[in-house]
Amino acid sequence: MRKLSFKPVFDIDCEKWPTISTDFEIEHFLSTLSQRFDLEPITVLVRSKKWVREWSECPKAVACAWREDENSFVAFSKEIFVPLHPKWRVFRSWKERFFFLAVLHEFVHVYMRIKHPDILEPHSPEFFAMEQSLAREFGLRYLFV
């Protein structure tokens, strides 16, 4: 029996992703989503892959999200960026779709922790429903291969 896997692909006729090529632009995008969903702004951090994986206790993690002292944080692994200048980073094109999905994925984690603290399962059906809804809005969908 063949194992099904999926990859995210972009639809052409949907809302365009904003240009997010710096830490500030990622934070701005997440803050825009936060305003839309009535959340406080989210602080974006870039850390080592080792730090992200140790913090999240997941050997394949490239990002993580958490709440601390009523503030929300999202950390992304610096290995998914290509340094062009000390203050500027651009996404590696071959990982772009996966990174966009990771941005939405971590936002949904923050949203669920604030708006639905009673849902303890980190990847609940409600979590995936919201993630897929946001992904569809921006033209990101799953292609089963």
Which residue ranges define each predicted feature?
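Short alpha-helical catalytic segment bearing the HExxH-like zincin motif
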Residues: 98-106
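Active-site scaffold of zinc-dependent metalloenzymes
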Residues: 50-97, 110, 114, 121, ...
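Auxiliary, metal-adjacent structural segments of Zn-dependent hydrolase domains
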Residues: 17-72, 142-145
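Surface-exposed beta-strand-to-loop junctions
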Residues: 7-10, 106-110
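Active-site or metal-binding loop neighborhoods of secreted/extracellular toxin and effector enzymes
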Residues: 122, 133-139, 145
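Short histidine/acidic/glycine/proline-rich micro-motifs that form metal-
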Residues: 16-17, 116-118
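Acidic, serine/threonine- and proline/glycine-rich low-complexity repeats
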Residues: 1-14
